[in-house]
Amino acid sequence: MSTAARNESQNHELSFESRSHPSELLPRLRPFYSTSLGAAYLGDSREMLAALPDGSVNLAFTSPPYALHFKKEYGNVHKDDYVEWFLSFAREVYRALADDGSFVLNIGGSYNKGLPTRSTYHLKTLIALVDEVGFHLAQETFWYNPAKMPMPAEWGTV
């Protein structure tokens, strides 16, 4: 079974290129969700990426654990170790990503412990993705989350 990947030509007409369906690339794994256009898998992305052939992924979308000051049950890395920790994962994404593929990364900022200043770990991570892995930064998006204060309350002006 194949699926069609959309590519736009210079005159903005759509052309379709045949690509393998994820179920053909990961025959031993059962998709969490699947359509004729693709599939989503639930699991440890580091293990799943290792099973994928080079250049076989059109979209990698992830929200890894943030470098927080307190430990979460799912595990998180200290900001001083974050860049190297994340780059090992990002190199696998880069290997598996198709030449025309996209990598969407949701990475949150944090404040320096005990100070009214922001950490730069997320900026260092983005720079390392470009300089050390080979990604191209295409766009940054900032989203509004009304559920949480964006900083420790004592440092905010309300």
Question: Predicted regions: what is each one?
Answer:
Residues M1-V158:
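Core catalytic lobe of class I
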